[in-house]
Amino acid sequence: MLSNYVVKEILNDNKLKREYEFTIDNKYFFSQLDAKLLEIAKNVKIPGFRAGKASIDLIKKEYLNNAVNTLIRKIVEDTSSEFIKNGKFGEIISSNVSVISCPDYGMGVSSTSGDPAGDNLVYKLSFEVMPEAPLIALDDIVLSDIEADIQDSDISEFIENLKKQCSEFVEVSDSEYRVKMGDKVVVDYQNRIKGKMLKGGDTKDLAVIVGRGLVLKDFEDQLIGMKIGESKSFPIQFPDNYGVAYLVGKSADVSVTVKNIFMMKAIEENENVIKYYQFKDEQALKDFARNKIKQQFDKISFAIVKKELFDYLDKTYSIDVPECVVTKEIDKINQEIQDSAGTVQVDVKAEAMKRVKLGILLVKMSRHHNISINKDDVFSFINTYYSDYGISLNDVLRMLQSNKDFANYISGKVLEDKVINYIIRLVKKDKKVMTTQELNLMLENM
C-alpha cells in the first residue's frame, strides 16, 4: 500500500510528540470506492430487483455515503497502522486522527472512466510515544530499614481500644435515668394516620439503638430524654425516600412508651476481653496485640520508605513525560483533592508529572527484571489495604470482579508495591529503631 499514499512530517519535537499528514492517491481512493459499491451491489437486496441486478446509480443513491465513510475509516486504519509499524516508533501511548479533506465523491468515476476530480483524502495522525527510561541503578540507593520498638504501653493502649470495641449493653436500674444517644431503648408504640391505626402500627418490645438510624430520625429524637415507664405522643413525617410507597410524604401520630433502657458499658477487665475474643490466656491476648501493632507498624514504615525511594528517584532521574498521561493524572489528583474536601495542598501539575515519571521508571524496572503479579499478590494487597477504601473486604472483592477500571487500578498498585519491595530488598540499608510514636510523627510530617 506504500505507493498509494504520501506522508509529510508536520511535528517532531525530538521528544515525544509526532504529527504526520497523509495524502491518499485519488485513483486508489476511487478504485476502492468503486470496488466497495460493486460489492454492495452484488449482495444487497433492493425491493423490485433481483440480487445483484440493481443499477450502480441506484446503489450510489442509497449507499454512497455509508460506503465512503466505511472506506475512509478502512484507509485511515490501514495506512496509519502500516506507517507506524514500519516507522519503529516504539510504544505509542495515544493517537488521534483528524480528516482534513476528502475527494468530491459525487464526481467520482468508475474504473473505466477518466481521472477523478476534486481534493485528495488528506488526514492528520498525531500521537505520543513512550520515552526511553533509564534502568534504576540499585547500587546507588540507600533506604531506611525501620525496626519496631513496641513497648508495653503500646500493648496496653491496644487492649484498651479492644475493650471499647467489645462494649456491651447493661440494663439501667436508675428510674430517673434519661435516654441518651447510643442507648438501647425497648418501647411499645402505636402509629395512626387521621386516627386510623396503620397496618403493623401497633408494636410491642421494639428495641431501638438511638443514633443508629434504623428507624426514622424524628422517632429517635423524641426518645432522647425519656425515662423508664414514660409515655408521650408526637407527630412524625414520612420522608420522600421512605420504603413504603403509600406512606411517602404523609404525617402520622405516634404514641410511645419506654419499657426499658440499656446503656453501653465498656469491658473493664482484661479477663473479660480474653473471654469475649476467646483467647487462651492473657499472654495470648498480648501476643495478638503485639502482632497487630507490628502489622500496622510495617504498613506505616513501608509508606515512609516508599516515599524515601520516590523522592530519591524524582531527584535523580530526569525524563520527558507524555503530555496525554500527565493530563489524565492531573484529573485524578484534582478528584483526590475534591474527595478530601480541599485538605490536600499540592502543586497539581508538578505532582502529576512526578507520578508519571515514577510510573515509567517502575514499569521499566518490572520489565527488565521480569516482575509480574498473580492472584495471590492481588488478594494479599487487598487484605492489607481494603480498610483504606472505607468498605468491607467482600465489597472490594466484588468491585474487583465487576469494575474494570478499579481492577486495573488495583493491579497497577500491586505491581508498583511488588517492584518497590524488590528494590528495597536489594539496596543498601540504614537501620533505624523507632517507637510507634516516633513512626507516627514521621508519617504526619511526610
Curated annotation (Swiss-Prot):
NCBIfam families: tig (TIGR00115). SUPFAM superfamilies: FKBP-like, Triger factor/SurA peptide-binding domain-like, Trigger factor ribosome-binding domain. It is found in: Cytoplasm. Involved in protein export. Acts as a chaperone by maintaining the newly synthesized protein in an open conformation. Functions as a peptidyl-prolyl cis-trans isomerase. InterPro entries: PPIase_dom_sf, PPIase_FKBP_dom, Trig_fac, Trigger_fac_C, Trigger_fac_C_sf, Trigger_fac_ribosome-bd_bac, Trigger_fac_ribosome-bd_sf, Trigger_fact/SurA_dom_sf. Its main location: cytoplasm. Its EC number is 5.2.1.8. It comes from the Bacteria. This is Trigger factor. It catalyses: [protein]-peptidylproline (omega=180) = [protein]-peptidylproline (omega=0). GO terms for cellular component: cytoplasm. It is an enzyme of class 5 (isomerase). Belongs to the FKBP-type PPIase family. Tig subfamily. It comes from Ehrlichia ruminantium (strain Gardel).
